[in-house]
Amino acid sequence: MNNISFIGMAACGKSTVGKAVAEKLNENFVDTDLLIEQKNGLSLEEIKNKYGYKFVRAEEEKVILNLNSSYKIISTGGSAVYSSKSMMHLGTFSKIIYINTPLEIIMKRIEVEQKRGLAVPEGMLIPDIYNEREPLYQKYSEITLDGSMTIQKLVDEVLKHFHE
């Protein structure tokens, strides 16, 4: 299987690593968050504010279920793991890699990138989301990588698994 889908929290490095891997392998890359934004003509944050968190999740599922093996390197939104249908679908044509980045690092990155769209239900904090999703990331991933490694080390680790 030569396709890869990245899962993990927002700001864990999915898109950065995915783009770098795609570039190294000269393959295409797609970010499901960007597909949702393109489809709706708004940022994730604007979509969430206008239509609500559940709408974002439903859009994410639709976008993922429309993907196929022609998409070689895929970065999913952090909440994709809430849809078992989405995860099963990705698993039919790609290796699912979880970038397990410590909460402290994620919090720092989110602080720096405040423009980042983060679909968080009303009343929940990032540590709550992290703790809720972590078992789901473990459940659906074939491979777990340490997200505290440098981008280059993460890319090297992914490349080791790409042709298995």
Language-model segments: residues:
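Conserved glycine(s) of the Walker
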Residues: 13
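ATP-dependent small-molecule kinase phosphotransfer cores
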Residues: 34-88
